[in-house]
């Protein structure tokens, strides 16, 4: 588990628990025109999200013309920020907080929470709760980004509409006590907006300008806007492409696939058939030489003594499952 429940009373932020519980219902409201959802439900379009995401992607396209004019250090910095933000999602919100596939000591949890704010993909609590719903109710109406509704919906469209009522109702029934018990999760949620402004936009922009004299214009569009847009789309490919394209050597009866190209961009998160078959496995991929920087990072943290109790599917368990339900592709 991410953190001991006994820590909950040691910090003056207990009211954050109530804010989190209130957040469970925050996606229900909203007005605006409606569109058909799954099984005929009408879902309100969130026009603010449509406009902001459209502007973000237009900004990213414009950023491409600035690349030849930027200093090489700025491009390296943007890539470093991409990797840092990615770890906040993959090693943090996903493998640590959503699946509890390993334990992390307080310094590592703080680092991952800060990195997660740089990713700006919802706070740890909401991300983890929705991801647990995605696994428990995969590709049903209770799945926040149900791939059965098509590539566009599972990639980005799910962010353009209010959550399906099944996502809200089933989400309330999930056990999230471990998330509520972790002060790092509560504090990050309480101060999420300011942490996102600082970590996703201010810090990535100011470092190139202040340290090696990059223009603020180039710094903002390359290290913030372009980097953030690429980061979002690579993460979304796990929800879309990795549920549609690839083989299924572990379970042919589920939609998630092995997609090495997604794994390459998402630092190890594309071995999705394996992950949905063995969600408790901290590596999210089978033994071997798979490209999985997130696993390498967790292993390094264990070597430093900052992470422990890595959970792993055994080789006999994996082979037995492949023989029973795999598609014989591996």
Curated annotation (Swiss-Prot):
<feature type="short sequence motif" description="Histidine box-1">
    <location>
        <begin position="94"/>
        <end position="99"/>
    </location>
</feature>
<feature type="binding site">
    <location>
        <position position="49"/>
    </location>
    <ligand>
        <name>substrate</name>
    </ligand>
</feature>
<keyword id="KW-0209">Deafness</keyword>
<dbReference type="InterPro" id="IPR005804">
    <property type="entry name" value="FA_desaturase_dom"/>
</dbReference>
<keyword id="KW-0560">Oxidoreductase</keyword>
<dbReference type="GO" id="GO:0005789">
    <property type="term" value="C:endoplasmic reticulum membrane"/>
</dbReference>
<protein>
    <recommendedName>
        <fullName>Stearoyl-CoA desaturase 5</fullName>
        <ecNumber>1.14.19.1</ecNumber>
    </recommendedName>
</protein>
<feature type="topological domain" description="Cytoplasmic">
    <location>
        <begin position="1"/>
        <end position="49"/>
    </location>
</feature>
<feature type="binding site">
    <location>
        <position position="272"/>
    </location>
    <ligand>
        <name>Fe cation 2</name>
    </ligand>
</feature>
<keyword id="KW-0479">Metal-binding</keyword>
<dbReference type="GO" id="GO:0005506">
    <property type="term" value="F:iron ion binding"/>
</dbReference>
<dbReference type="InterPro" id="IPR015876">
    <property type="entry name" value="Acyl-CoA_DS"/>
</dbReference>
<feature type="binding site">
    <location>
        <position position="135"/>
    </location>
    <ligand>
        <name>Fe cation 1</name>
    </ligand>
</feature>
<dbReference type="GO" id="GO:0004768">
    <property type="term" value="F:stearoyl-CoA 9-desaturase activity"/>
</dbReference>
<keyword id="KW-0275">Fatty acid biosynthesis</keyword>
<feature type="binding site">
    <location>
        <position position="163"/>
    </location>
    <ligand>
        <name>substrate</name>
    </ligand>
</feature>
<feature type="binding site">
    <location>
        <position position="162"/>
    </location>
    <ligand>
        <name>substrate</name>
    </ligand>
</feature>
<feature type="topological domain" description="Cytoplasmic">
    <location>
        <begin position="94"/>
        <end position="193"/>
    </location>
</feature>
<feature type="binding site">
    <location>
        <position position="134"/>
    </location>
    <ligand>
        <name>Fe cation 2</name>
    </ligand>
</feature>
<comment type="subunit">
    <text>May self-associate and form homodimers.</text>
</comment>
<keyword id="KW-0812">Transmembrane</keyword>
<feature type="transmembrane region" description="Helical">
    <location>
        <begin position="50"/>
        <end position="70"/>
    </location>
</feature>
<keyword id="KW-0256">Endoplasmic reticulum</keyword>
<dbReference type="Pfam" id="PF00487">
    <property type="entry name" value="FA_desaturase"/>
</dbReference>
<feature type="topological domain" description="Cytoplasmic">
    <location>
        <begin position="239"/>
        <end position="330"/>
    </location>
</feature>
<feature type="binding site">
    <location>
        <position position="122"/>
    </location>
    <ligand>
        <name>substrate</name>
    </ligand>
</feature>
<comment type="function">
    <text>Stearoyl-CoA desaturase that utilizes O(2) and electrons from reduced cytochrome b5 to introduce the first double bond into saturated fatty acyl-CoA substrates. Catalyzes the insertion of a cis double bond at the delta-9 position into fatty acyl-CoA substrates including palmitoyl-CoA and stearoyl-CoA. Gives rise to a mixture of 16:1 and 18:1 unsaturated fatty acids. Involved in neuronal cell proliferation and differentiation through down-regulation of EGFR/AKT/MAPK and Wnt signaling pathways.</text>
</comment>
<dbReference type="GO" id="GO:0016491">
    <property type="term" value="F:oxidoreductase activity"/>
</dbReference>
<keyword id="KW-1010">Non-syndromic deafness</keyword>
<feature type="short sequence motif" description="Histidine box-3">
    <location>
        <begin position="272"/>
        <end position="276"/>
    </location>
</feature>
<dbReference type="InterPro" id="IPR001522">
    <property type="entry name" value="FADS-1_CS"/>
</dbReference>
<feature type="binding site">
    <location>
        <position position="276"/>
    </location>
    <ligand>
        <name>Fe cation 2</name>
    </ligand>
</feature>
<feature type="binding site">
    <location>
        <position position="94"/>
    </location>
    <ligand>
        <name>Fe cation 1</name>
    </ligand>
</feature>
<comment type="similarity">
    <text>Belongs to the fatty acid desaturase type 1 family.</text>
</comment>
<feature type="binding site">
    <location>
        <position position="243"/>
    </location>
    <ligand>
        <name>Fe cation 2</name>
    </ligand>
</feature>
<keyword id="KW-0276">Fatty acid metabolism</keyword>
<keyword id="KW-1133">Transmembrane helix</keyword>
<feature type="short sequence motif" description="Histidine box-2">
    <location>
        <begin position="131"/>
        <end position="135"/>
    </location>
</feature>
<keyword id="KW-0443">Lipid metabolism</keyword>
<feature type="transmembrane region" description="Helical">
    <location>
        <begin position="194"/>
        <end position="214"/>
    </location>
</feature>
<keyword id="KW-0408">Iron</keyword>
<feature type="transmembrane region" description="Helical">
    <location>
        <begin position="216"/>
        <end position="238"/>
    </location>
</feature>
